[in-house]
Structures are given as structure tokens and as C-alpha cells.
Amino acid sequence: MTQLPSAHPSPMTSRVEDSRTLVLERLFRASPERVFAAFSQAEHLRRWWGPRGWEMPVCTLDFRPGGRWHYGMKCTDPAQGQFFGMESWGLGVYREIEDGARIVYTDYFSDAQGGIDEALPATLVELTFTAQEGGTRVVNRSTYASEEGLKTVLDMGMLQGITETWDRLVEGLGAAPA
């Protein structure tokens, strides 16, 4: 068996299913309760959501079916060139929640007021959290209305961004008490 590097104890895997669903998987070395809390509480999301060099100064969360998660990220890293100072806004609308096990929401690009940007594709996101030896396996299924919608976000660098985001979550879980 190959030893994984300690900085990334379990790399994220990705695959496309049915030409419009991106499936991401990763093992996080923490309990399902801790990993689920990281996805469901604003104080945790603020610390890790977004790619490296981005902060989340705005994060309002009403974590219940029908509730909304509105967030704003800002690039604070001058080394990111044209992205430095840029803001990116999102709006999640929760559809289903199974405490500790599953979150389903529709993710939209938005503006600072929470208005949906209809020019960019919406995503139906299903997150599952499963206990297994060594931690919690998270599976993220992101489904788009069309193959073109998935291609749009992939061309925007979404896969690199979520890889960095989940790396930040690994680091945050490692720094938090067990």
C-alpha cells in the first residue's frame, strides 16, 4: 500500500457522471460530528470556505430546510494578480438536512444583496457524511441543469478552488480539538 503524504492524508477524488454531475470525495480525519459541524455552522465556514488567499467577511446562515446561506468572499492575496480585491458572492438554499449525515441545497451565484445571478449556472448539491475507519468520508454530488453548466464552472477554475477549500478544511480540522 502506498503511503499518502502527511500534508494531505486523503486527497480529493473527482469524476463526472452523466455529463452534468461532478462527484467529489475525500476522507477527513475527524468524526462525522466535527465534519458536519464544519459545513453547517457559520463560525466554522468562515474559517475554511474558499480557495487559498480568499477570506469570507460575510456569512449569514439559517441552517434548516428552506433556510439560506448567503456569503461573500474576497481575494486578499496580492500574489493572485487580477483576482486581488475581487469579491465573489453565493447563495445556498437548503432543501433537505439529515443531522450529521446529509445536506442538500441549491447553490447560486449571487450579488451582495443575495439576488441570484441568472447568467451563471445553479447547482444542486448533495453532501453525504459517512463514518469509516480513519474518519469521515464526504461525498459531494454537484448536478447542473446541463453539460454546458458544468463546463462553465469547470472553466472558471471551480475544481481547483474546491480542492484548495477542502485542503483548508483539513487544516482547520487538524487545528481544532478532537
Task: Please identify what each model-predicted range represents.
Residues R26, V58-L61, G90-E96, A122-T130:
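Hydrophobic/aromatic beta-strand elements that line small-molecule binding cavities or substrate pockets
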Residues P32-E33, L61-G66, R95-R102, T128-R137:
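A short, structured loop/turn motif at beta-sheet edges
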Residues V35, L45, W69-Y71, Y94, ...:
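Hydrophobic pocket/interface hotspot
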Residues A79-F84, L91-S110, G114:
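Contiguous, well-ordered beta-strand patches that form the walls/edges
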